[in-house]
């Protein structure tokens, strides 16, 4: 499935906004992030903030990629790797989530994020070639 440049930009704006918002939440309200999103194992506000910093940086980079097409594929491939490794990590820790079902649901959602990021990277590469 090929999408237009305009549609890709709209998707990238949404991806950027999600990561900026989630990153800011983890960075400035780590306890809330832990309780509502990342409830795995014992809480460590510093590490939650570290995750927030990375998510925020990724969101900003995707936002820049909206207007700098040369950035798109590399940033999105980075996202695919990050989400892929993140999903593998979650697969080993499903029992530490609020419930086993939540653990596997999170793992699958994160793996889907990896697949979507890889697909968007390929779309970006195709569009850059004309």
Describe the residue ranges of each PLM region.
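Membrane-helix boundary connector in multi-pass membrane proteins
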Residues: 88-105
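Membrane-helix interface segments
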Residues: 7, 70-74, 100-103
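Cytosolic juxtamembrane helix and N-cap/initiation of the first transmembrane helix
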Residues: 1-18
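Core segments of alpha-helical transmembrane spans in multipass integral membrane proteins
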Residues: 22, 44-66, 81
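Individual transmembrane alpha-helices with interfacial aromatic-anchor signatures
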Residues: 48-53, 100-113
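Membrane-water interface at the C-terminal end of transmembrane alpha helices
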Residues: 112-130
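Hydrophobic alpha-helical membrane segments
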Residues: 75-90, 111-116
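Hydrophobic transmembrane helix segments
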Residues: 17-48, 52
């Amino acid at each position: 499935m090929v999408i237009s440049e305009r549609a890709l930009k709209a998707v990238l704006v949404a991806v950027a906004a999600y990561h900026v918002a989630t990153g800011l939440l983890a960075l400035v309200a780590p306890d809330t992030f832990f309780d509502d999103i990342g409830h795995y194992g014992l809480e460590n506000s510093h590490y939650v903030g570290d995750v927030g910093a990375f998510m925020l940086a990724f969101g900003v980079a995707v936002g820049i990629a909206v207007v700098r097409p040369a950035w798109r594929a590399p940033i999105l491939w980075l996202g695919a790797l990050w989400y892929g490794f993140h999903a593998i990590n979650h697969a080993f820790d499903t029992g530490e989530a609020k419930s086993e079902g939540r653990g596997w649901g999170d793992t699958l959602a994160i793996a889907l994020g990896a697949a979507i990021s890889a697909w968007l990277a390929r779309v970006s590469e195709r569009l850059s070639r004309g």
